[in-house]
């Protein structure tokens, strides 16, 4: 499958290029390379605070992979917030290799989850955060979108 199969939103804002590792119930490791078509570039730079979107996309892929194991399809998830967001460099450049490792801390049956994410730029820690996400069931999403 392609990354776009795991992230049910516009491919124009898909920032992840490949899945490196997926351990069900535990973690995901994904890779991206900053390119010139990246919609988040400003003056050729990807500002580090936008790394939160890359982390969130890694969790979207993780959730979609978990749903795939249960025979379900990918759905929208929501980034509720973050804590302990630390940035160790101000920006990333075109050509930089980004690897994100996200580990499940808490995931309950309602779809609420807490994940520890680390983002590495060319092998060095570039940012990290604790992300709170909601990945509700399909019925909840249908109802929310119809209102």
Which residues does each predicted region cover?
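Short aromatic-glycine motifs in intrinsically disordered, low-complexity regions
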Residues: 1-10
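Catalytic strand-loop segment that frames the active site of acyl-thioester-processing enzymes
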Residues: 11-47
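Small-residue-enriched segments and motifs
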Residues: 14-17, 80, 100-102, 129
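Conserved positions in beta-strands of structured domains
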Residues: 17-20, 88, 103-105
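Compact, glycine-rich, soluble single-domain proteins
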Residues: 43-62, 76-77
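HotDog/MaoC-like acyl-thioester-processing domains
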Residues: 61, 93-99, 103-147
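Hydrophobic beta-strand-centered segment that forms part of the acyl-chain substrate-binding groove
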Residues: 61-101
């Amino acid at each position: 499958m392609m990354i776009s199969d795991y992230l049910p939103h516009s491919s124009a804002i898909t920032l992840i290029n490949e899945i490196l590792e997926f351990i069900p119930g535990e973690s995901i490791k994904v890779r991206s390379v900053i390119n010139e078509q990246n919609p988040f570039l400003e003056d050729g730079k990807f500002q580090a605070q936008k790394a939160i979107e890359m982390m969130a996309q890694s969790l979207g892929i993780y959730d979609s992979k978990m749903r795939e194991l249960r025979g379900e399809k990918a759905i929208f998830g929501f980034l509720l917030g973050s804590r302990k967001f630390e940035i160790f460099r101000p920006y990333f450049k075109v050509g930089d290799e980004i690897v994100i490792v996200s580990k499940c801390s808490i995931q309950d049956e309602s779809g609420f989850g807490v994940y520890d994410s680390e983002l590495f730029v060319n092998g060095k820690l570039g940012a990290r955060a604790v992300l709170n996400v909601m990945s509700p069931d399909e019925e909840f999403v249908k109802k929310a979108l119809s209102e």
